[in-house]
Design a protein with these regions (language model features):
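N-terminal catalytic or cofactor-binding beta/alpha core of small enzyme domains
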Residues: 1-138
C-alpha cells in the first residue's frame, strides 16, 4: 500500500468553502524513522501529535456546508503542515516537555525529504482544491 500524505472528502462538493485540517492525524509514515519517532503511545495520543477530535469536526463541518475538505495524514511531529517551510518549529525536537527523539538528529536533508514526502504534496493538493473556484473561502 502506498502512503498518501493527505485525504480529501467531497472533492466535488459545490460550496465555495474549503475546510482544511492540518493536524488531523497522529500517524508517522513508515518511510519516516521506520514509522516511529521514539514517542510513546500515550504521548502520540495527546495534542502534541495532532489536534484530538479535529478530524471528525472538520469532516462534519464540511458535510454540513456541502464543502470539500482536506486532511493531513501525518502527525505534526513528523513535519508541521501549519508552518512555513522556513519556520524553525517545522520539525520539533521538543514539544510540550516531550523529547521527539526521531527528530533529534534530523538534518537539512531529512527536513527536505519530509517536505517532499508529506508537506508539499498536502499543500499542493490544498492549492489545487482552492483554485477550483476563484472565490474560495478557506476554513482551517
Amino acid at each position: 500500500m502506498t502512503y498518501e500524505p493527505f485525504r480529501i472528502e467531497g472533492a466535488d462538493r459545490p460550496a465555495r468553502w474549503l475546510i482544511t485540517c492540518d493536524h488531523a492525524a497522529n500517524t508517522v509514515p513508515p518511510c519516516v524513522a521506520d514509522g516511529d519517532l521514539g514517542v510513546d503511545a500515550a504521548d502520540m495520543a495527546r495534542h502534541i501529535a495532532y489536534d484530538v477530535g479535529a478530524d471528525g469536526l472538520a469532516s462534519a463541518l464540511a458535510a454540513r456546508l456541502n464543502a470539500p475538505a482536506i486532511f493531513a495524514n501525518f502527525s505534526r511531529l513528523v513535519i508541521d503542515p501549519n508552518r512555513g517551510e522556513d519556520d524553525p518549529t517545522l520539525m520539533m525536537k521538543l514539544y510540550d516537555g516531550t523529547i521527539i527523539s526521531g527528530n533529534r538528529h534530523a538534518d537539512a536533508a531529512e527536513r527536505e525529504r519530509r517536505l517532499d514526502l508529506c508537506y508539499r504534496p498536502y499543500h499542493h493538493a490544498l492549492a489545487q482544491l482552492a483554485a477550483r473556484q476563484g472565490n474560495t473561502i478557506i476554513v482551517s
